[in-house]
């Protein structure tokens, strides 16, 4: 389906964030049958202040037959910080991993870029069809790889977490995210509903993923400083990483 084009925060952000936001939405529109996913009105576009700087958050959400929620968040804190955050939450009736991607930048540079297709199975492995497709992608060598956080055992062996050191490395990261998205969307379209037992396991896997992601202290601290701990907790658990039911 088509959606009315709206001015986006991405036009004011780092070029890689703008390019990645466009890339994600282009892949979604190309492959999937999108319909709107409605957030509470007060959480779609949010403004606040942090350390004297204006904080702006823009959320766009969709859903499809295979994904209960596809969330693209853009955030900006004056000239200090630019953020892109994206997660595709599968419906538990489908045996699909979690696509996640984040960019963090400030003062004209990207300091962190991460993308992954994270397994939700108890044995922490991706479906074989994913492993086969991802293993065929060329190995990328970045000059400044970064270490995953302590709770990062939710990520797969194909996870990329880097500080892009040049425009060429930014382009490499962008290209790999598009490859992840193409693989993920095509696998989702070809997938079939699973057994009731597998649905229960998928729910448990998504709960684990969301619970671990809610431990991201950096995100929580920024939100608490700008909006207070109650608002931050609500946003973390209803917008960013809501648990499936």
Swiss-Prot record:
Gene3D superfamilies: 3.40.1500.20. It is an enzyme of class 1 (oxidoreductase). Keywords: Oxidoreductase. Pfam families: Fe_bilin_red (PF05996). Its EC number is 1.3.7.5. GO terms for molecular function: cobalt ion binding; phycocyanobilin:ferredoxin oxidoreductase activity. Coiled coil: none annotated. It catalyses: (2R,3Z)-phycocyanobilin + 4 oxidized [2Fe-2S]-[ferredoxin] = biliverdin IXalpha + 4 reduced [2Fe-2S]-[ferredoxin] + 4 H(+). GO terms for biological process: phytochromobilin biosynthetic process. Catalyzes the four-electron reduction of biliverdin IX-alpha (2-electron reduction at both the A and D rings); the reaction proceeds via an isolatable 2-electron intermediate, 181,182-dihydrobiliverdin. Belongs to the HY2 family. This is Phycocyanobilin:ferredoxin oxidoreductase.
